[in-house]
């Protein structure tokens, strides 16, 4: 299977998000990379589903709560930026203060 570097990045991100989902299901709190992966994957999947940039910026803030991440992670994570593919091209989606 031949994958471009971008496709490899998306696959790695999806794998990290899947791991984060499993850890959440076991009741574990997520660390920084897991939180970023889960939020990023939600944005990418939302773009694939046809949502707008504005909808995805809002969706990204609903993925995780402070109770689901390790102490200090919410304060460390100010923005999550993801290049998502939309029907009209690739756009940068920025989720500000994603963990509330």
UniProtKB/Swiss-Prot annotation:
<comment type="pathway">
    <text>Nitrogen metabolism; urea degradation; CO(2) and NH(3) from urea (urease route): step 1/1.</text>
</comment>
<dbReference type="GO" id="GO:0005737">
    <property type="term" value="C:cytoplasm"/>
</dbReference>
<keyword id="KW-0378">Hydrolase</keyword>
<dbReference type="GO" id="GO:0043419">
    <property type="term" value="P:urea catabolic process"/>
</dbReference>
<keyword id="KW-0963">Cytoplasm</keyword>
<dbReference type="InterPro" id="IPR002026">
    <property type="entry name" value="Urease_gamma/gamma-beta_su"/>
</dbReference>
<dbReference type="GO" id="GO:0016151">
    <property type="term" value="F:nickel cation binding"/>
</dbReference>
<protein>
    <recommendedName>
        <fullName>Urease subunit gamma</fullName>
        <ecNumber>3.5.1.5</ecNumber>
    </recommendedName>
</protein>
<dbReference type="GO" id="GO:0009039">
    <property type="term" value="F:urease activity"/>
</dbReference>
<dbReference type="InterPro" id="IPR050069">
    <property type="entry name" value="Urease_subunit"/>
</dbReference>
<dbReference type="Pfam" id="PF00547">
    <property type="entry name" value="Urease_gamma"/>
</dbReference>
<comment type="subunit">
    <text>Heterotrimer of UreA (gamma), UreB (beta) and UreC (alpha) subunits. Three heterotrimers associate to form the active enzyme.</text>
</comment>
<dbReference type="InterPro" id="IPR012010">
    <property type="entry name" value="Urease_gamma"/>
</dbReference>
<comment type="similarity">
    <text>Belongs to the urease gamma subunit family.</text>
</comment>
<dbReference type="InterPro" id="IPR036463">
    <property type="entry name" value="Urease_gamma_sf"/>
</dbReference>
């Amino acid at each position: 299977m031949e994958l471009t570097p971008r496709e490899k990045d998306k696959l790695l991100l999806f794998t990290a998000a899947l791991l984060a989902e499993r850890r959440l299901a076991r009741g574990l709190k997520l660390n920084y990379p897991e939180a970023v992966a889960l939020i990023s994957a939600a944005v990418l999947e939302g773009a694939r589903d046809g949502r707008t940039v504005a909808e995805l910026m809002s969706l990204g803030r609903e993925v995780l709560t402070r109770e689901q991440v390790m102490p200090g992670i919410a304060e460390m994570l100010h923005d999550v930026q993801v290049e998502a593919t939309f029907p009209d091209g690739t756009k940068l989606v920025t989720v500000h203060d994603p963990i509330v």
